[in-house]
């Protein structure tokens, strides 16, 4: 339609222009004066102004009436449906009421009560510790068979005495020898053993004492003391006990008030040997009545 209107307007304009043109006798075309130009301007203004608004009116009326129609449907339909879907949000708080009611009641009531109940079987565990009491009881029985061992030397005293004397002979020789570890050297002893020999004798003494059974170690130390006493009685006037006194003094052992007496020598030996060899001797070892008091001098001196 627009093209037809434009073509008609152009045709009308050309016809009007050709009608107004004047040809001179010289052959030149003379255009009309400026007065006729407003006349063709009237049809240009009148015709397009009337025809051109018509398509604008059609385009404006047609889309404006059709497009608002879907706009009315979309807001009405989803806006009404979405609030309706919000209604199922109400049943969600309902199961929340069931969860706190069911699990909270059984868990505090059932599991808390059985867990303190299995703590009761913990009481038999200290009861099962009671069988640990018979273990120290058989330990008490072990010293009981030591009693026949004490009676064994009474039955075979000569064999036990000779065995202990032979075993403890290195200890007696070490206690009576003059070594260079002594601070005061006796003028009556001319031979002084070197340090290496003294160390060897001390090691032999401690090894022999460690090999003796523990229940006989006290008796073995008593045998050493008795041998020294017997040797002193044979060699009266000779200061054979000076190395023993000096050794005890070097070990920090308090000497008895009367070391020359038998009990003083015995107590000094009982303190010196365990300290030197690091051997445990029971405290009642000094009060035990050993069968060496009646030993002949010949046996103790050899």
Swiss-Prot record:
The keyword Cell membrane is assigned to this record: no
GO molecular function, one term: nutrient reservoir activity
Any Pfam family: Gliadin
Compositional bias annotation for Low complexity: 42-102, 125-159
InterPro entries, per database record: Bifun_inhib/LTP/seed_sf, Bifunc_inhib/LTP/seed_store, Glia_glutenin
Annotated region (Disordered), positions in chain: 27-159
Keywords: Repeat, Seed storage protein, Signal, Storage protein
Skewed-composition ranges (Pro residues): 103-124
Region forming the signal peptide: 1-19
Function text: Gliadin is the major seed storage protein in wheat.
Extra remark: The gamma-gliadins can be divided into 3 homology classes. Sequence divergence between the classes is due to single-base substitutions and to duplications or deletions within or near direct repeats.
Similarity section: Belongs to the gliadin/glutenin family.
Protein name: Gamma-gliadin
């Amino acid at each position: 339609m627009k093209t037809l209107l434009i073509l008609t307007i152009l045709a009308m304009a050309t016809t009007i222009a050709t009608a107004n043109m004047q040809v001179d006798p010289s052959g030149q075309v003379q255009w009309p004066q400026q007065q006729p130009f407003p006349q063709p301007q009237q049809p240009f203004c009148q015709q397009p102004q009337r025809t051109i608004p018509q398509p604008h009116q059609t385009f404006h009326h047609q889309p404006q009436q059709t497009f608002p129609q879907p706009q009315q449907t979309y807001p009405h339909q989803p806006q009404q449906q979405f609030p309706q879907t919000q209604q199922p949000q109400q049943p969600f708080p309902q199961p929340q009421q069931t969860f706190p009611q069911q699990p909270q009641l059984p868990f505090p009531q059932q599991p808390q009560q059985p867990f303190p109940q299995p703590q009761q079987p913990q009481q038999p565990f200290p009861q099962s510790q009671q069988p640990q009491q018979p273990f120290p009881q058989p330990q008490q029985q072990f010293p009981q068979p030591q009693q026949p061992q004490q009676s064994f030397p009474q039955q075979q005293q000569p064999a036990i005495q000779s065995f202990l004397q032979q075993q403890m002979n290195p200890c007696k020789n070490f206690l009576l020898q003059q070594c260079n570890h002594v601070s005061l050297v006796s003028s009556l002893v001319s031979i002084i053993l070197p340090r290496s020999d003294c160390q060897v004798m001390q090691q032999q003494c401690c090894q022999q004492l460690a090999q003796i059974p523990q229940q006989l170690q006290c008796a073995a130390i008593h045998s050493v003391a008795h041998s020294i006493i017997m040797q002193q009685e044979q060699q009266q006037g000779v200061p054979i006990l000076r190395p023993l006194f000096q050794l005890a003094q070097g070990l920090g052992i308090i000497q008895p008030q009367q070391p020359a007496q038998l009990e003083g020598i015995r107590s000094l030996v009982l303190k010196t040997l365990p300290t030197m060899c690091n051997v445990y001797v029971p405290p009642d070892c000094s009060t035990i009545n050993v069968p060496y008091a009646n030993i002949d001098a010949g046996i103790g001196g050899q």
